[in-house]
Amino acid sequence: MNKGIMRPGHVQLRVLDMSKALEHYVELLGLIEMDRDDQGRVYLKAWTEVDKFSVVLRERDEPGMDFMGFKVVDEDALRQLERDLTAYGCAVEQLPAGELNSCGRRVRFQAPSGHHFELYADKEYTGKWGVNEVNPEAWPRDLKGMAAVRFDHCLLYGDELPATYDLFTKVLGFYLAEQVLDENGTRVAQFLSLSTKAHDVAFIHHPEKGRLHHVSFHLETWEDVLRAADLISMTDTSIDIGPTRHGLTHGKTIYFFDPSGNRSEVFCGGNYSYPDHKPVTWLAKDLGKAIFYHDRVLNERFMTVLT
């Protein structure tokens, strides 16, 4: 049941060196720098996104994800979700408007998986970058690198998947689009959606809490993914796997690392889903094909390198 959460809105990442990180996220991925704040954070967006930012970079000594944020339809829905989280037993933290530049107040909570999430209703509307709102051209001609279309999702590793599933489905209004079941029928991976996408956030069982597997950005075509692979080679960027196709979600994809070790994905295509669809199910014994549909063999680095 929809509770008023519309979409993934932003992610804040820790990076070791800001100038090197910007080479990755701006020059290679093609995000646009929109702002900086007095904490030294840098605010980025993809060109089709209408709000001011979707990625925030913060320079620290350890890489990883600080939090992921979801945009809520309005302040009334935000207040109701805050009440629902509190009634469910979640400790919520209030962050005032302006703590993130150009963003309204945020309600932050920690999932049983150990990850921090936040909800907000207001962010400065800047429109799509480089095109007019009336009679817009197909795309801006001065995009850089891979010309990422949008911030799409995060895949996260942590424990307590059943409790995390209950929180996201019962309180926040997500639904289960795809899953992986082990030989006992226990869900070891859950792909949760707010929309018609195969996932807006996904969780994989892992004994450590609060780990980041990757942040993903959408491209339009398979040719764009192949071009991304060319750019990865041209820039001598550390590659993880791909180009290939997933069995899970059926997305066509490539994975690579930022200079701090955070994993990035760019992808195109993939399954669509609706809340009345039965979840797409893969079996853990076939996980090689579920993740790497062509090779059908697991890559240890893909499974174990986390931030």
Curated annotation (Swiss-Prot):
<keyword id="KW-0677">Repeat</keyword>
<dbReference type="InterPro" id="IPR037523">
    <property type="entry name" value="VOC"/>
</dbReference>
<comment type="similarity">
    <text>Belongs to the extradiol ring-cleavage dioxygenase family.</text>
</comment>
<feature type="binding site">
    <location>
        <position position="214"/>
    </location>
    <ligand>
        <name>Fe cation</name>
    </ligand>
</feature>
<dbReference type="InterPro" id="IPR017624">
    <property type="entry name" value="Catechol_2-3_dOase"/>
</dbReference>
<keyword id="KW-0058">Aromatic hydrocarbons catabolism</keyword>
<keyword id="KW-0223">Dioxygenase</keyword>
<feature type="domain" description="VOC 2">
    <location>
        <begin position="150"/>
        <end position="269"/>
    </location>
</feature>
<dbReference type="InterPro" id="IPR000486">
    <property type="entry name" value="Xdiol_ring_cleave_dOase_1/2"/>
</dbReference>
<dbReference type="InterPro" id="IPR004360">
    <property type="entry name" value="Glyas_Fos-R_dOase_dom"/>
</dbReference>
<dbReference type="GO" id="GO:0042203">
    <property type="term" value="P:toluene catabolic process"/>
</dbReference>
<protein>
    <recommendedName>
        <fullName>Metapyrocatechase</fullName>
        <ecNumber>1.13.11.2</ecNumber>
    </recommendedName>
</protein>
<feature type="binding site">
    <location>
        <position position="265"/>
    </location>
    <ligand>
        <name>Fe cation</name>
    </ligand>
</feature>
<dbReference type="InterPro" id="IPR029068">
    <property type="entry name" value="Glyas_Bleomycin-R_OHBP_Dase"/>
</dbReference>
<dbReference type="Pfam" id="PF22247">
    <property type="entry name" value="Diox-like_N"/>
</dbReference>
<dbReference type="GO" id="GO:0018577">
    <property type="term" value="F:catechol 2,3-dioxygenase activity"/>
</dbReference>
<feature type="domain" description="VOC 1">
    <location>
        <begin position="7"/>
        <end position="122"/>
    </location>
</feature>
<keyword id="KW-0479">Metal-binding</keyword>
<feature type="binding site">
    <location>
        <position position="153"/>
    </location>
    <ligand>
        <name>Fe cation</name>
    </ligand>
</feature>
<dbReference type="Pfam" id="PF00903">
    <property type="entry name" value="Glyoxalase"/>
</dbReference>
<keyword id="KW-0560">Oxidoreductase</keyword>
<comment type="pathway">
    <text>Xenobiotic degradation; toluene degradation.</text>
</comment>
<comment type="subunit">
    <text>Homotetramer.</text>
</comment>
<dbReference type="InterPro" id="IPR051332">
    <property type="entry name" value="Fosfomycin_Res_Enzymes"/>
</dbReference>
<keyword id="KW-0408">Iron</keyword>
<dbReference type="GO" id="GO:0008198">
    <property type="term" value="F:ferrous iron binding"/>
</dbReference>
<dbReference type="InterPro" id="IPR054560">
    <property type="entry name" value="XylE-like_N"/>
</dbReference>
